[in-house]
A protein has these predicted regions:
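Hydrophobic alpha-helical transmembrane bundles of multi-pass membrane proteins
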Residues: 1-311
Length: 311
């Protein structure tokens, strides 16, 4: 939060410097209006959107480094975690977010579409988590065996309350509705809610079917994993596609993510977190495919206005 206040917001949404990084004109949140200056309901120009959008975008900036470290917290010293959560946003998250959501070179040159953080949040965290997993498992091969997280999951696996698990996933879906709706200031709120829901449902069903086909058995956890993957995929495209294509996107997202997850477990064990849901395959892969689906299935008006949506 302090880093975002000091330089983060300005690096992302400040005046673009040749498309690569924002200027420091909004450092310490200077010259940020208290209320939006634009009356255009279809445009969310973050440099003029007021402190409410500063807070909203800050949630992305806080979540990003935390998601990278979330499954390896017991294997990293507090000093190392603090160093990572300072340097990674400065050199990875802030520049990349400016390129896509801050009028940078990716949004202005090749018209990259990112609806609600599919590329800037979930793709970057999934990729970073993948690389971090490879490094930790190479450097500390016994880390998972000594991890308190893994010991706890092993002890609680049989006694887990699946009713609470399903309720928790439903609450997460409700929160995701707000995330996607706020990211697009227009009258398409109903369509966004519908697309988010259908993408999650399609991914949950397809993830479950893939696991059942491969292992001959399934559990409620497989549905939850699929729903989370679908929600991540919806963050890339739910404002640009029709309901039928959101369902298709969800089914394909769940299928690809689950299949790649199984393949990685069997063939690339050094690249995957064994006993925890892997961020790469639950959020990273779905977000990448969701971004591709946004380009494949989006209608013309949404694509034309895609670069005006910066919230």
């Amino acid at each position: 939060s302090v880093l975002w206040f000091a330089v983060g917001y300005s690096m992302v949404f400040g005046q673009s410097q040749k498309g690569f990084i924002g200027a420091m004109d909004h450092a310490l949140l200077l010259d940020v209006p208290e209320a939006p200056r634009t009356e255009n309901k279809t445009e969310c120009d973050t440099s003029n959107s007021g402190v409410s959008m500063v807070i909203f975008e800050m949630t992305f900036a806080i979540l990003a480094p935390a998601m990278v470290l979330i499954t390896w917290t017991t294997c990293i010293k507090p000093t190392g975690a603090m160093l990572f959560m300072t340097l990674w946003p400065l050199f990875v998250y802030y520049p990349l977010t400016h390129w896509i959501r801050g009028h940078g070179w990716l949004s202005s040159t090749i018209k990259v579409i990112d609806f609600a953080g599919g590329l800037t949040l979930f793709t970057t965290t999934g990729t970073a988590h993948f690389l971090l997993t490879i490094w930790i498992k190479h450097k500390f091969p016994n880390c998972e065996k000594l991890s308190l997280v893994d010991q706890y999951l092993q002890e609680e696996r049989e006694s887990r309350n699946f009713i609470l698990l399903i309720l928790g996933s439903l609450l997460t879906m409700v929160g995701w509705f707000s995330l996607n709706v706020i990211s697009f200031r227009s009258s398409k709120h109903g369509l966004i809610l519908l697309n988010t829901h259908y993408t999650a449902c399609g991914a949950g069903i397809s993830w479950l079917l893939v696991v059942f086909t491969y292992t001959g058995q399934s559990s409620c956890m497989d549905i939850v994993y699929g729903v989370m993957a679908g929600l991540a995929g919806s963050s890339s495209c739910s404002g640009y596609v029709a309901p039928w294509s959101s369902m298709a996107t969800g089914c394909l997202t769940g299928f690809l993510s689950s299949a790649l997850h199984i393949l990685a477990r069997n063939q690339m064990s050094r690249c995957i977190r064994e006993n925890c849901p892997d961020i790469t395959f639950m959020f990273g892969i779905p977000a990448i495919f969701g971004s591709i689906a946004a380009g494949l299935f989006s209608n013309t008006p949404a694509t034309e206005n895609a670069n005006e949506v910066k919230g």
